[in-house]
């Protein structure tokens, strides 16, 4: 359904500039609640700034500050968007360079110019190196400040921004930083039909080649259980994707699906047509993939490390994030978080719960009988009450 607007659709032969698709249709970002929320944000303050335990590039434990800036959002979302991404909820269309510099200054002041923080992660709900999203002068500020302060820098980018020209410019300011790419799946069918990513696995390969040419570190994001995929398929596919990208990635960050408001996956979840992954599946994924990143069974920082495997379950233990029965969730999430730092499978010793039998049965069912993809039974409450008609 088209929204009323003073300007209509651009017709063939008309030289007028066309409106964005999100201005023309009732996309989630154009709903009244989304518009009201966007305009309520103070553009001079970042979305959030916080510190977490991390590992330096040479394997030493450290503290890292994460700066999530409030921006215009991702250019891919302007025209289409990924099925799972709700980062548009934290954006404002009118953010400019002055606003971004004010946000950056606020982040530095909050952590005393990042004193005691070995690493700075800068996230923009899009790509820092995309000129359509982020003014070039602000890109330069982030790159230069982190270089002059001696901080390890991590930024995010889609593949299309990582041209030789752009990387040559960026490395002339900061010659040593990490670029995190949201690949999500090393599978073109999944990228197109499950995720709607807007690029191919081959485009990731080419981007990584260019990053390595400029001696930049590569962090690869993979999605666990994208929409329209069963629990067992998610586990089997993700192990294969880890194996496919490990040699080219300094770090692999697995992002278990969490439900973000106003997205395709949100609608599926509300209609009981999708359920986030089990925490047990994440433990199994780590156990099946550890030998890929540590062929000799080592720990993070050991000589056998090919890549570092990281999982930080967003909303872990909650219904809209990876969860189990509710009794064991906290303990399992904590073990997964510890593994991300230590790289030790011993973190999972002694973990058990009655719900593990139900999880195992679900995997068996997924592999033996046809079921609606990604649904699965609820894991909490009485099964009799869940199945009873309302």
Predicted regions and their residues:
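Distinct, well-ordered alpha-helical segments
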Residues: 132-140, 163-172, 231-232
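Acidic (Asp/Glu)-rich catalytic clusters
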Residues: 108-115, 142-148, 168-176, 209-215, ...
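Canonical Radical SAM [4Fe-4S] cluster-binding loop centered on the CxxxCxxC motif
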Residues: 41, 45-102
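Active-site-proximal loop/turn and secondary-structure-junction residues that shape catalytic pockets
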Residues: 126-128, 159-161, 185-187, 224-228, ...
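Auxiliary Fe-S-binding modules of radical SAM enzymes
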Residues: 1-45, 259-390
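Core AdoMet radical
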Residues: 86-103, 107-134, 145-162, 176-204, ...
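Conserved C-terminal portion of the radical SAM core fold
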Residues: 202-263, 283-313
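Active-site glycine- and acidic-residue-rich loops that bind
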Residues: 160-163, 196-198, 227-240, 275-280
